[in-house]
Curated annotation (Swiss-Prot):
General function of this protein: This protein binds to 23S rRNA in the presence of protein L20.
Alphabetic keyword roster: Ribonucleoprotein, Ribosomal protein, RNA-binding, rRNA-binding
Entry annotated with the keyword Transmembrane helix: no
GO molecular function terms noted in the UniProt entry: rRNA binding; structural constituent of ribosome
Gene label: rplU
Protein name per UniProt: Large ribosomal subunit protein bL21
């Protein structure tokens, strides 16, 4: 069984037992959270698509850790004007373990 959930402005296809890195969620490590914005639920060749959400569906997950992604380097330059700008960015994430899908 799999589900498509929406969290942090992005959509993820998840199944029970998978690990997933999502945008940072304010929850403690080891806490169990519920992702209730389920867009679709499927099992085998059957698929249930919500409009926009599947009613009564939820995904239970456990917070494994919090961390930061690798640095993305931004470099801006204007030719012939001696203008250069260096910038870096590291996005925070929360790693989840999908425990169960309730449909």
């Amino acid at each position: 069984m799999y589900a498509v959930v929406k969290t942090g402005g992005k959509q993820y296809k998840v199944a029970a037992g998978e690990k997933l890195k999502v945008e940072q969620i304010p929850a403690d490590v080891g806490a169990e959270i519920t992702l209730d914005q389920v867009l679709a639920v499927g099992a085998g060749d059957q698929l249930k698509v919500g409009a926009p959400l599947v009613s009564g569906a939820a995904v239970k997950a456990t917070v494994i850790s919090h961390g930061r992604h690798d640095k993305v380097k931004i470099f801006k330059m204007r030719r012939r004007k001696h203008y250069q700008k260096h910038q870096g960015h590291r996005q925070n994430y929360t790693e989840l373990r999908i425990d169960s899908i309730v449909a």
